Amino acid sequence: MTTPKPMLLIPVENQVRELDPKLLLACVAGRRGFSSVIGSRREMEMRIDHFPRSIYLSKSMTVRSLLFFWVAAKFGHDIITWDEEALVHLPPEIYFSRRLNPAAIRYVTHLFAWGEENAELWRRYPHLPPAIPIHVTGNPRSDMLRPELHAYYADETEAIRREFGRFILVTTTFNHVNACGPDMNLFKP
């Protein structure tokens, strides 16, 4: 008899941006024998003591994560992490100071990188625990762009095409240079 795999806890903070990719992750995990719970990050963190020992997927390792990581570890949960902001990032020293906390990262058992460049960035972090494995896996947000998944959004895509015709979308909301308030821009002209 095999030991059952632990449950995977997949929190969602921004439903529009995160829910579909995390559903994809839960499906892939399910094929590999993992049960998953997907829910509001806030609610999941407030009720972490109600879950059996599980694997909690965090999207960051900032100082704000520290208290929750400590509590989750006290209840026997493993914490695995990717960084949602690591695909395109600030220079390493600034990235390290804003996105990684030396105390928080000590609670993390596995890191999942967007790609080799992300993994290399983490390897250069001076406070990286030496035994922490870094897995280059990509990210389900980018997986949603794969051709075999285009049908998932086919109805929405067709409705947009009917309404607007052919167009080019230029995204201009980059938080470092065009934040919602000018005082929040990291770089100023």
Region annotations inferred by a language model:
Residues 181-189:
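A solvent-exposed, charged loop/short amphipathic helix patch at secondary-structure junctions
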